[in-house]
Structures are given as structure tokens and as C-alpha cells.
Curated annotation (Swiss-Prot):
Protein name: Small ribosomal subunit protein uS13
Function: Located at the top of the head of the 30S subunit, it contacts several helices of the 16S rRNA. In the 70S ribosome it contacts the 23S rRNA (bridge B1a) and protein L5 of the 50S subunit (bridge B1b), connecting the 2 subunits; these bridges are implicated in subunit movement. Contacts the tRNAs in the A and P-sites.
Pfam families: Ribosomal_S13
Keyword Oxidoreductase in record: no
Entry GO MF terms: rRNA binding; structural constituent of ribosome; tRNA binding
UniProt keyword Isomerase present: no
Composition-biased stretches (Basic residues): 107-120
InterPro entries for the chain: Rbsml_uS13_C, Ribosomal_uS13, Ribosomal_uS13-like_H2TH, Ribosomal_uS13_bac-type, Ribosomal_uS13_CS
Amino acid sequence: MARIAGVDLPKKKRVEYALTCKNGIGLKSSREILEAVGISFDKRVHELSEDEVSSIAKKIQQSYLVEGDLRKKVQMDIKSLMDLGNYRGIRHRKGLPVRGQTTKNNARTRKGKKKTVGSK
């Protein structure tokens, strides 16, 4: 099993799809990586040599934010929005939808369970 940047890639999958198991790498970027390194898309993970695995890992490390670094960057971006106090930051702080969705009837996932306001 090939291990790249702390993630074990599935053995039997094609390399272009196996790379998408890493957080931060989609199908398009995995194809870009394989083109840059010069590996065929049709190769399976168990067919890769150690040199090919190391070249893929080197390319990912040079060009992409993946796994923990990506998560940390996203959290820092959200925190900076909250510190600025702009509209998106306030919505994040209150736990409401950020991208313009209506909250009169829906947004239960984001708002949590219903709270009854008054009773007779």
C-alpha cells in the first residue's frame, strides 16, 4: 500500500482516483500531478514503483495544501472573518447560514433543534 503524506492509498484503484482520497486533491489536480510527474492515468497503485511514489509525494508537497495544513488554513480564514466582524463573520459566529440562504423555515442543520419560544 502506497503512503503519501500520511494517507494510505487504496491498492487496487487507479492512481488518478486514489489520489483523490487525500483531503485537498480532486480529480483535476490529481490528473495535473500525474501529467507533471509523467505517470499514466491507467496505472494502479500497487503497480507504482518507489521512485514514482516519491515523485508524486514531492510534487504534492511543493504545489498543494493538503490534509491538516488545508484544514488549518480554512479554520484560520473563518477565524479572521469572525475577528473582522463583517457579515460573513457574524453569521459564522451565530451559527447561521453564511451564503444567503433563508432561515425563516429551514436551516435546521445549521441552527440546531427547534426551541419553543412561548406557550400558553
